[in-house]
């Protein structure tokens, strides 16, 4: 600790000192608010709104607003906010993250900033990690908010559009992070303003903020449509991979291995060696999937390479019951940070299809991205952002760097007395498991409940089998049994209870020492008062037993890549001043040690074990683990920061496109925009054939006539104009062409009416914009995947990506204008007389064909035999609709056939 810190205190301490002055002010108001009647207390909400309208700020009314919520909570919920919860609430009204230890009442704390900021009327979003927590927190706090005149909504998957709109219209909306992000994307795919759900993104309060803004940061939210089917190719290529041999390190000038591929476990990437490439190519040629003499890396084989690499990654880097589970014939992803299954989510880049082929389940078609956004960029759209979690301080630098959020550590209401014991290291996993089982046996004998944390479904099941063998009764909480999560967590605090859990560890639900009598009461159908009293008495007895045994004991079966996840596991114990203990058991075979400690360090540590099954505890061990975790955290931070720098480029473009879409949805008449675009497009086309300020000899009039005819359906005799009028120069010629285009368009508008034409313009613009944006997203994906290769040419990939993506975006906007004007100019508007004439001609023709016993289809398309139908008795203009009813111009339909005859 520096001298300055000793004198002035840390920044965190200085912030807390300042906030404690506000707490004193709020506490002084308590007697006055206690004296208010219910109606007077309820009336405070309207009073605060009026004061805000009158020019007061949120900070000015904060003490009174917090005092109001505290008093209402006492009356409605029977809970009084602690002073530390008031401090947490004040931190959350600013752009800050409140680190509040597990069990300190984050749900109740959130009511303070939510009420205060909802007074502005812009809406408040309380963001949770799953549906269960969103529903639970909303129902818990609903009586309090409704007492104060605030409406509460819940936004979870599966709601109808009306229910969603109602949820978003509420003053305070509880929602999952994924549903908020997807609704934002859906809003920007809507075809009318009535289809949109979200209003202004004002204030988001993110619960478990580290899970959402750090762990989920690399996961983009994607809405996709079906792309071309290629499942057969995944199944074919899947047969090749088992024959490939792994090589420990990449080939260099000094080292030439004999394997077919190498793995980078840190970044989860696989690479073919030269030997592997040849082997794959030989196999593909033998299977008839690639012609002889071709290369896997040739441009024409890029799709085949994509399938091979996806299959290689699926077999070598993604494990069943670790990264995913197979359930009901489908591959379900397991969240590496929480251990929860993520139903409905699919890996991109063909990886999910490759894993489906590997596991022998139905291979679904690949998808094409229609809209996407990362959590990083979605949550940065909010005017105000705040978050709370039990473990944020280790990631404080990242929160500040990426989101501009300062982390404030909130003191606990009662001192934390948990005993965090030194880590124990073993030579291998078997010795480690033996020690864990002995520790569990000891706890069970002393009637101390145990929570054992594992990093994967696979490890939880291995340990479960070992406990079964040892005859120890236990519960398992992992991705396969997540439906029973609340029930298992409710039982985890009973005397001698043993619970094995993946990283999820019942996060968001307290483990109550002695068990949860309320959960037991909920199982009973209409419990009597006597039954409830009996359950309470039983709980008090069990609670006393567990307290004497030392509270909840936490066992970590290995260190996670992030210290934060380890702290979350430890945080299940020692809540609100309860006793508790924790210890991590490690082995040299653990993933963290294998991937992030070099072979030299591992060998050095291996030599320290002189007796089989011996345990090692030392300060050096703690330093080695801390060093490995710091490396991993730095690696992942760089990855997230790098991803954000690339995504920021796409984000600027996304913002521009969505702004354009919203303009289109909010305006019924976009004719001015269409007119401006028409001028740009026609002038752009004319420039290509009549360069500005050029000589007449440089003009390509024939090319211009053909282009205008082909793309815009305009038959203009420009050559004749020039012959007839010697004074027709470049500028007047441009004006004449544009005037004719506008005149023809006005004639169409007069036929159908202004409103109908404006509606059509809007529809064409939206449809074209969506289609081109979808294609642009696919192009951006391909660019992103290959841009690193520019590094070999001594170019900065990030700068190249920015440059290329800007060029592609500009081309897309030009293409948008061109396609819209081309569609609007070519559209054929029929008069009532023309439609009636076409219908008569169609019926006459059908009658003639039927008389000759020739088939005619329902769409009135002419058959091969009807090509010689004689229309010479009726004079038909070349540009008139063909009387056969095909919808084509006569010159492009039967007119051309008559001419040939």
From Swiss-Prot:
Residues 849-866 have a biased composition (Polar residues). Residues 836-845 have a biased composition (Basic and acidic residues). GO terms for cellular component: cell envelope Sec protein transport complex; cytosol; plasma membrane. Its main location: membrane. It comes from the Bacteria. InterPro entries: Helicase_ATP-bd (IPR014001), Helicase_C-like (IPR001650), P-loop_NTPase (IPR027417), SEC_C_motif (IPR004027), SecA (IPR000185), SecA_CS (IPR020937), SecA_DEAD (IPR011115), SecA_motor_DEAD (IPR014018). Its cofactor is Zn(2+). It is a peripheral membrane protein. Keywords: ATP-binding, Cell inner membrane, Cell membrane, Cytoplasm, Membrane, Metal-binding, Nucleotide-binding, Protein transport, Translocase, Translocation, Transport, Zinc. ATP binds at residues 85, 103-107, 510. Residues 888-901 have a biased composition (Basic residues). Zn(2+) binds at residues 882, 884, 893-894. PROSITE patterns: SECA (PS01312), SECA_MOTOR_DEAD (PS51196). Monomer and homodimer. Part of the essential Sec protein translocation apparatus which comprises SecA, SecYEG and auxiliary proteins SecDF-YajC and YidC. Part of the Sec protein translocase complex. Interacts with the SecYEG preprotein conducting channel. Has a central role in coupling the hydrolysis of ATP to the transfer of proteins into and across the cell membrane, serving both as a receptor for the preprotein-SecB complex and as an ATP-driven molecular motor driving the stepwise translocation of polypeptide chains across the membrane. Belongs to the SecA family. This is Protein translocase subunit SecA. The lineage of its organism: Bacteria, Pseudomonadati, Pseudomonadota, Gammaproteobacteria, Pasteurellales. The gene is secA.
């Amino acid at each position: 600790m520096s001298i300055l810190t000793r004198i002035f205190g840390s920044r965190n301490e200085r912030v807390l000192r300042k906030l404690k002055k506000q707490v004193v002010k709020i506490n002084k108001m308590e007697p006055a608010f206690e004296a208010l009647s219910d109606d007077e207390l309820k009336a405070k909400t309207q009073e605060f709104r009026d004061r805000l309208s009158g020019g007061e700020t949120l900070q000015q009314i904060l003490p009174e607003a917090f005092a109001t919520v505290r008093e209402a909570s006492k009356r409605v919920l029977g809970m009084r906010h602690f002073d530390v919860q008031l401090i947490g609430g004040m931190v959350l009204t600013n752009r800050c993250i409140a680190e509040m230890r597990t069990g300190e009442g984050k749900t109740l704390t959130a009511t303070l900033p939510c009420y205060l900021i909802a007074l502005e009327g812009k809406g408040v979003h309380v963001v949770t990690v799953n549906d269960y927590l969103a529903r639970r927190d909303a129902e818990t706090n609903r009586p309090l908010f409704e007492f104060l005149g605030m409406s509460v909504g819940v936004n979870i998957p599966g709601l109808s559009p009306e229910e969603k709109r109602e949820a978003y219209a509420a003053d305070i909306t509880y929602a999952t992070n994924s549903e908020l992000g997807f609704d934002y994307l859906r809003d920007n795919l809507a075809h009318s303003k009535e289809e949109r759900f979200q209003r202004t993104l004002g204030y988001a309060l993110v619960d478990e903020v580290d899970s959402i803004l750090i762990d989920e940061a690399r996961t983009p939210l994607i809405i996709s449509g079906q792309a071309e089917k290629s499942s057969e190719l995944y199944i074919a290529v899947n047969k090749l991979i088992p024959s490939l041999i792994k090589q420990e390190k990449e080939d260099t000038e000094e080292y030439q291995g004999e394997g077919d591929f190498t793995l980078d476990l840190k970044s989860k990437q696989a690479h073919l060696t030269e030997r592997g490439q040849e082997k794959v190519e030989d196999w593909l040629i033998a299977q008839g999937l690639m012609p002889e003499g071709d290369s896997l890396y040739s441009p024409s084989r890029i799709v085949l390479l994509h399938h091979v690499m996806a299959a290689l990654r699926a077999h070598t880097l993604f494990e069943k019951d670790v990264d995913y589970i197979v359930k009901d014939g489908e591959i379900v992803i397991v969240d590496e940070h929480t251990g929860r299954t993520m139903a409905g989510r699919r890996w991109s880049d063909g990886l999910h299809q490759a894993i489906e082929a590997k596991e022998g389940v139905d291979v679904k078609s690949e998808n094409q991205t229609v809209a996407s956004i990362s959590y990083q960029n979605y949550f940065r759209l909010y005017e105000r952002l705040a978050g709370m979690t039990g473990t944020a301080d280790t990631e404080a630098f990242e929160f500040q760097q990426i989101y501009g959020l300062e982390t404030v550590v909130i003191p606990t209401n009662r001192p934390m007395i948990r005993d965090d014991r030194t880590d124990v290291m073993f030579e291998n996993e078997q010795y480690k498991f033996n020690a864990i089982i002995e520790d569990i046996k000891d706890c069970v004998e002393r009637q101390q409940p145990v929570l054992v944390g594992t990093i994967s479904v696979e490890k939880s099941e291995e340990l479960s089998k070992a406990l079964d063998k040892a005859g120890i009764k236990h519960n398992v909480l992992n991705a396969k049994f997540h439906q029973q999560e609340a029930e298992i967590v409710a039982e985890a605090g009973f005397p001698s209870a043993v619970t094995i859990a993946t990283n999820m560890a019942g996060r968001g639900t307290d483990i109550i020492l002695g068990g949860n009598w309320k959960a037991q009461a909920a199982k009973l159908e209409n419990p009597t008062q006597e039954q409830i009293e009996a359950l309470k008495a039983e709980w008090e007895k069990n609670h006393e037993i567990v307290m004497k045994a030392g509270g909840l004991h936490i066992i970590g079966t290995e260190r996670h890549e992030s210290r934060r996840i380890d702290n979350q596991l430890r945080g299940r114990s020692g809540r609100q001043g309860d006793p508790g203990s924790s210890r991590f058991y490690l082995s040299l075979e653990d993933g963290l040690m294998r991937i992030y400690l070099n072979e030299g360090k591992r060998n050095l540590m291996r030599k320290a074990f002189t007796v089989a099954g011996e345990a090692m505890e030392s300060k050096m061990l703690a330093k080695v683990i801390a060093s490995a975790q710091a490396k991993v955290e730095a690696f992942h931070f760089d990855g997230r920061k790098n991803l954000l720098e690339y995504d920021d480029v796409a984000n600027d473009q996304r913002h521009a496109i969505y702004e354009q879409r919203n303009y289109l949805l909010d305006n019924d008449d976009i004719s001015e925009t269409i007119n401006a675009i028409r001028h740009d497009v026609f002038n752009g086309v004319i420039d290509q054939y009549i360069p500005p300020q050029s000589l007449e000899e440089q003009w390509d009039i024939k090319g211009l006539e053909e282009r205008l005819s082909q793309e815009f359906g305009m038959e203009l005799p420009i050559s004749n104009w020039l012959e007839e009028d010697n004074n027709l120069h470049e500028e007047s010629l441009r004006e004449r062409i544009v005037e004719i285009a506008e005149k023809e368009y006005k004639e169409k508008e007069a036929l159908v009416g202004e409103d109908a034409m404006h509606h059509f313009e809007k529809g064409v613009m939206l449809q074209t914009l969506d289609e081109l944006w979808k294609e642009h997203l696919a192009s951006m994906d391909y660019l992103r995947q290959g841009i690193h290769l520019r590094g070999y040419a001594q170019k900065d990939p990030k700068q190249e990506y920015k440059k290329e993506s800007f060029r592609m975006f500009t081309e897309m906007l030009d293409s948008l204008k061109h396609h819209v004007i081309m569609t609007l100019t070519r559209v054929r508007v029929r008069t009532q007389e023309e439609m009636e004439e076409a219908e008569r001609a169609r019926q006459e023709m059908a009658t003639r064909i039927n008389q000759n016993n020739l088939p005619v289809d329902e769409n009135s398309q002419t058959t091969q035999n009807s090509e010689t139908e004689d229309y010479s008795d009726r004079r038909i203009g070349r540009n008139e609709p063909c009387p056969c009813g095909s919808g084509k111009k006569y010159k492009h339909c039967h007119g051309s056939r008559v001419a040939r005859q």
